Amino acid sequence: MAPMKLYGAVMSWNLTRCATALEEAGSDYEIVPINFATAEHKSPEHLVRNPFGQVPALQDGDLYLFESRAICKYAARKNKPELLREGNLEEAAMVDVWIEVEANQYTAALNPILFQVLISPMLGGTTDQKVVDENLEKLKKVLEVYEARLTKCKYLAGDFLSLADLNHVSVTLCLFATPYASVLDAYPHVKAWWSGLMERPSVQKVAALMKPSA
């Protein structure tokens, strides 16, 4: 069977969120670059993959998927379902909770920081420090909750690695490309959790993928 195709750009933390899940699941896939400069993401061919004209999109045979966290769940269900713990109702529920927390709390606070520090200058803009500072305060409040949670268990959903943990990888790697990575220093259990994730071959591969070429 042909490898799955993941369409997008490695500079997109939504694409590398998918890549992390695909790597951890041991999926056979390839990244197919999309040229934003030529508006390829708005082309008729790409709109078949993602009708919103965005990335990422995943093709697996005749199946097309979009939305990064849905792609991550598909990768887990197909090749490593234990990442979702669907055989245990309570554990699966906690995985779902922390997947939602990642999207609606952690990444919601981190996204504006990453955009202001990493993306805006690339687009010829400037960094709005007020936005950065406001969202750093939001992120600290989120990290307080994470710290409390990780004093009770090794991973977010329990004492087992799950997709909930892996979904944090891409944006946290981006955080370390900013001057604000030290925000984690005040949360020792969060730092230990992150260090453990960084030891995983899947995470190391995605980290290498995200590094700019020399």
From Swiss-Prot:
Domain GST N-terminal: 2-83
Sorted UniProt keywords: Transferase
Record's catalysed reaction(s): RX + glutathione = an S-substituted glutathione + a halide anion + H(+)
GO CC annotation terms, alphabetical: cytoplasm; protein-containing complex
Keyword Transferase appears in the UniProt entry: yes
Protein EC: 2.5.1.18
Pfam families on file: GST_C (PF00043), GST_N (PF02798)
InterPro entries named among the record's database cross-references: Glutathione-S-Trfase_C-like (IPR010987), Glutathione-S-Trfase_C_sf (IPR036282), Glutathione_S-Trfase (IPR040079), Glutathione_S-Trfase_N (IPR004045), GST_C (IPR004046), GST_Phi_C (IPR034347), Thioredoxin-like_sf (IPR036249)
Amino-acid positions noted as binding glutathione in the UniProt annotation, renumbered to this chain: S12, H41, K42, Q54, V55, E67, S68
GO molecular function annotation: glutathione binding; glutathione transferase activity
GO biological process, any: response to xenobiotic stimulus
Chain ranges of the GST C-terminal domain: 88-214
Tissue/organ expression: Expressed in the stem and leaves, lower levels are seen in the pollen and endosperm.
Subunit-level organization: Homodimer or heterodimer of GST-I and GST-IV (=GST-II).
Family that this chain belongs to: Belongs to the GST superfamily. Phi family.
Function: Conjugation of reduced glutathione to a wide number of exogenous and endogenous hydrophobic electrophiles. Involved in the detoxification of certain herbicides.
Record-given protein name: Glutathione S-transferase 1
Upper taxonomic lineage: Eukaryota, Viridiplantae, Streptophyta, Embryophyta, Tracheophyta
